[in-house]
Amino acid sequence: MSKILRTRIDPKERHILIWATVASVLIFLTSFAWIYGPVAIAYWTYQPQEGDILFQSLPKSILAKVMEGATDSPYSHCGIVTKIDGKWMVCEAYQKVTSTPLSEVIFRGKNYGFAIYRFKPDKQTLIDQTIRNVKEQFDKPYDVRFSMNNDEIYASELIYKAYRQASGGESLGKLVSLGQLRWEPYEETIRYFERGPVPLSREIITPRNLAEAEQLDLVFFHRIDTRPASAKMADAKTFTIEPSSGD
């Protein structure tokens, strides 16, 4: 007959084990709250409206790095907010044109940062048709070449064209040619995706130019500096401490 050996734990050791477990749980919860608490609060604080445009920085994308650097902007991606089957979603060109839960889009961004731009009151009558136009593009592939003249489509182009069609030809932001941007540091990457020379005359709508559209107002942002990178650098210089002269 086999015997079951029972190890008696000293009360002091049991006490230490319990407190160590409690401490580990508290450390985990504190770390979780530190990392995710602010963005969770921002998510619940933001009150979505149909047609809001969400801008963010994508942290692990080569093309996002090119877009932000070439345009001197914190934004490399955008999508339009709408309610689908009772849930807030973001219609976006991300790998392909699709709809993604708002929470998933927010938590996907660099530092969980995002900015919300809203159509001004006199333009809100165009929102429903703009969203319908966006949905007509569902399943179209993402355009890594940022060309506005093919069957593929990129994030800011999706919203720009949908609004332009809804408004009867009104531009949402200013088109710029690639040659007007700071493309030189990213020439190798551009040539790789282009499979040829840099198309300097190609006109594109960038996330920055879309955000600067006169039809939009910035209404909410979290953990993202909405200023151009050059403005941040200028501010940094303002706070530079000069070395002492030794007097």
Regions found by a protein language model. Give the residues of each.
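Cysteine-nucleophile amide-bond enzymes
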Residues: 2-247
